[in-house]
Amino acid sequence: NSVAPMVQLIDNHFGVEQAYITTVHSYTKDQSLHDSPHKDLRRARAGALSIIPTTTGAAKALTKIFPHLEIGGCGMRVPVPNGSLTDVTFIVKKDCTIEEVNKVFLEASKGSHKNYVAYTEDPIVSVDVLGNSASCLFDSQLTSVLGKMVKVVCWYDNEMGYSNRLADLI
């Protein structure tokens, strides 16, 4: 939901050779509030008390949408009830600057992706995204560029963003 626009925009403007996604997601209903039995021993731990490394289906889903790209990923469940982010590191084909990357997302938020991508220059945290209907609230302060490596971060309210994308289908 949040990562597809990120991949599309970076690929369209700078070309992507490889990408690695880290989803930092609020704990989910299949996690207990205290340590208890679970088939995944990490998810057996208290979701409201621990940062829990896990898998993400986002990378696999993206390779179906962008079959020409090599994409990997992992997830972290963190002890917040809502408000998540997607952190993506790209190896790009064309040189770019932080300003150029940010401009791509700013323009997309006002144009082609205005229903899906929002843009901020504010120093936000997870609670600040609650109720935001965008699939991807692009955090321009967290953009990094090191040679051909580009890192971007989008925040999202998983329930609100997902619900709005479902409503878009109607």
Model segments located where?
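A generic structural signal for alpha-helix starts
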Residues: 1, 95-96, 160-161
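Internal hydrophobic alpha-helix adjacent to the cofactor/substrate pocket in enzyme cavities
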Residues: 164-170
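C-terminal substrate-binding/catalytic lobe of Rossmann-fold NAD(P)-dependent oxidoreductases
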Residues: 17-150
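Glycine-rich phosphate/pyrophosphate-binding beta-alpha loops
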Residues: 77-81, 155-162
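Alpha-helical support elements that line or immediately flank enzyme active sites
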Residues: 1-14
